[in-house]
Amino acid sequence: MELDLISYELDEKTKEGIEKVVEKFFTKAEPDLVLIFDKAGRILACKGMDISDTYSEFISSILSALFFASEELTSMLDKNDEMKDVFYETKNRVFLMARLEKDFLIGVISRKNLSLGSIRLFFNHLVSDLNAVLKNLKEVEKKSLKISKEELKKKLDQILGS
């Protein structure tokens, strides 16, 4: 079994760039939550609802799964089609997800306090601006850790006290 380890380095300049772009989006769209995360659900940035790290990671993992399931469905229907973003709405909220540079994803959850057209327009600008910031993100050599399932189970049992 190989464990995927983080393959990017988030420097201060990039962090500040992300924060600035997200703050600009917040003043326009007033969303409930903005999450920027990698494809494994690890969070780069989180702004909005006052939620625990565990809960935000849980949300980002679900959003990641939704995005990639939608991407797979798109590919099954037409190999030449390309996933742009995922948009869906509930009675009270709007959910938007898109792929960013360097295999990052963004998820936005918003109450329906703006027109859907405005939310989508602001979201498209957000994605474009974040891509400009993330384009310069330093990638580091990806390391993989090989470990047997038995050894992993043993380590987890030690950590969890089982």
Curated annotation (Swiss-Prot):
Pfam families, per database record: Robl_LC7
Keyword Coiled coil: yes
Coiled-coil parts of chain: 129-161
Keyword list, A-Z: Coiled coil
GO-annotated biological processes: cellular response to amino acid stimulus; positive regulation of TOR signaling
InterPro entries linked: LAMTOR2-like, Roadblock/LAMTOR2_dom
GO molecular function, one term: molecular adaptor activity
Superkingdom of source: Bacteria
Protein name: Uncharacterized protein aq_1822
Organism: Aquifex aeolicus (strain VF5)
Upper taxonomic lineage: Bacteria, Pseudomonadati, Aquificota, Aquificia, Aquificales
